[in-house]
């Protein structure tokens, strides 16, 4: 397998391509990317005939920023006969490793979403054909991915179950709670799902912890913390949701988020302030260097150009400055589904 299919946010194809090219080279694997603006996917073609398979095994999916989901294969299948798409796709599947499951996908564009009904309808007969030809093995570490780009073109490939997103297309199925003050609440929930293993939630998001939410109004992120019974200082000059204030867990502080500092250390810092990445990075460094918190989730609003480079610059600076203070830190970034022109960072120190 020499081709990697990479789902990404529409408009971030160049960042996705730059990232996979750099990370692949670090693994000694070289190739080139095929991109199209706003297509919501990138295809990375390796020089080595097994380069994509090696990459998807060795490169930690968790380390990828702009890639929502990925799988390795041999390339696209075009001119699929409308009357029998199963036969050519079955032939392609038989050249791949046996898989434990089948996932049907589109790309995250309006054109892609229009194919959702086709994908859903096709999965049943295709799944039966795979089963009949012994292409499925419930114990296999691989998952089979099928992406339709049109009614006659598709990509087919495999991804390691333990080194890929658990969600089709890398898009979590989260529902907006009726009582949440804003849609931004889903961003923090998705961040927790991505950065913190489910088995660690009770320990790292424990009831009774204390958090500071910078730029909190009207309270989307604070709402998530309150649902975990975490005490929150909500810092914002704007108004907060009344029900949150009545919960007994929230203290609203009228202040500038960049100037506020807690009187005592807290467990969590969360920040969704719209500002330059360098300024947000400085604030995060200040909080950790002064011992104000041990964990943080924050957003970096990206510039129009050199967005991947900007994230890498912020990463290098944060880790470098904390490292110079003798602090051992873990820092990950991800462009979440609920992010827009931004990435979300998770930082903790040990």
Curated annotation (Swiss-Prot):
Query: Does this UniProt record's set of keywords contain S-adenosyl-L-methionine?
Result: yes
Main localization is cytoplasm
Q: Name one GO molecular function term.
A: S-adenosylmethionine-dependent methyltransferase activity
Enumerate the InterPro entries for this protein: RlmM_FDX, RlmM_THUMP-like, RNA_MeTrfase_FtsJ_dom, rRNA_MeTrfase_M, SAM-dependent_MTases_sf
**Alphabetized UniProt keyword annotations:** Cytoplasm, Methyltransferase, rRNA processing, S-adenosyl-L-methionine, Transferase
Q: Which reaction does it catalyse?
A: cytidine(2498) in 23S rRNA + S-adenosyl-L-methionine = 2'-O-methylcytidine(2498) in 23S rRNA + S-adenosyl-L-homocysteine + H(+)
Swiss-Prot/TrEMBL GO biological process terms: methylation; rRNA processing
The record's subcellular location field reads: Cytoplasm
Superkingdom assignment: Bacteria
What does this gene product do?
Answer: Catalyzes the 2'-O-methylation at nucleotide C2498 in 23S rRNA.
Similarity field = Belongs to the class I-like SAM-binding methyltransferase superfamily. RNA methyltransferase RlmE family. RlmM subfamily.
- What's the protein called, per UniProt? Ribosomal RNA large subunit methyltransferase M
Organism per entry: Cellvibrio japonicus (strain Ueda107)
């Amino acid at each position: 397998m020499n081709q990697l299919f990479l789902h990404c946010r529409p408009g971030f194809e160049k960042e996705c391509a730059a990232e996979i090219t750099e990370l692949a080279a670090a693994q000694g694997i070289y190739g080139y990317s095929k991109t199209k603006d706003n297509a919501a996917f990138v295809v990375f073609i390796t020089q080595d005939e097994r380069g994509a398979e090696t990459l998807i095994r060795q490169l930690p999916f968790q380390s990828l920023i702009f890639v929502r989901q990925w799988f390795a294969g041999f390339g696209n299948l075009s001119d699929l006969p409308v009357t029998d798409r199963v036969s050519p796709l079955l032939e392609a599947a038989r050249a791949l490793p046996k898989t434990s499951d089948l996932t049907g996908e589109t790309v995250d564009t309006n054109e892609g979403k229009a194919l959702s009904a086709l994908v859903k309808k096709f999965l049943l007969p295709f799944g039966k054909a795979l089963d009949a030809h012994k292409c499925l093995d419930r114990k296999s570490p691989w998952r089979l991915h099928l992406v339709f780009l049109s009614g006659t073109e598709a990509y087919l490939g495999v991804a390691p179950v333990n080194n890929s997103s658990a969600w089709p297309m890398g898009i979590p199925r989260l529902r907006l709670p009726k009582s949440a003050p804003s849609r931004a609440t889903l961003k923090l929930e998705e961040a927790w799902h991505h950065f913190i293993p489910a088995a660690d939630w009770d320990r790292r998001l424990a009831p009774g912890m204390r958090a500071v939410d910078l730029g909190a109004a009207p309270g989307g992120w604070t709402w998530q913390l309150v649902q975990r019974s975490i005490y929150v200082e909500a810092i914002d000059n704007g108004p907060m949701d009344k029900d949150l204030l009545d919960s007994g867990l929230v203290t609203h502080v009228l202040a500038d988020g960049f100037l506020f500092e807690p009187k005592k250390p807290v467990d969590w810092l969360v920040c969704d302030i719209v500002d330059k990445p360098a300024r947000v990075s400085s604030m995060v460094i200040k909080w950790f260097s002064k011992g104000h918190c041990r964990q943080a989730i924050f957003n970096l609003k990206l510039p129009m150009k050199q967005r991947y480079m900007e994230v890498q610059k912020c990463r290098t600076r944060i880790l470098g400055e904390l490292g110079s203070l003798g602090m051992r830190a873990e820092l990950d970034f991800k462009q979440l589904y609920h992010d827009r022109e931004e990435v979300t960072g998770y930082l903790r120190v040990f």
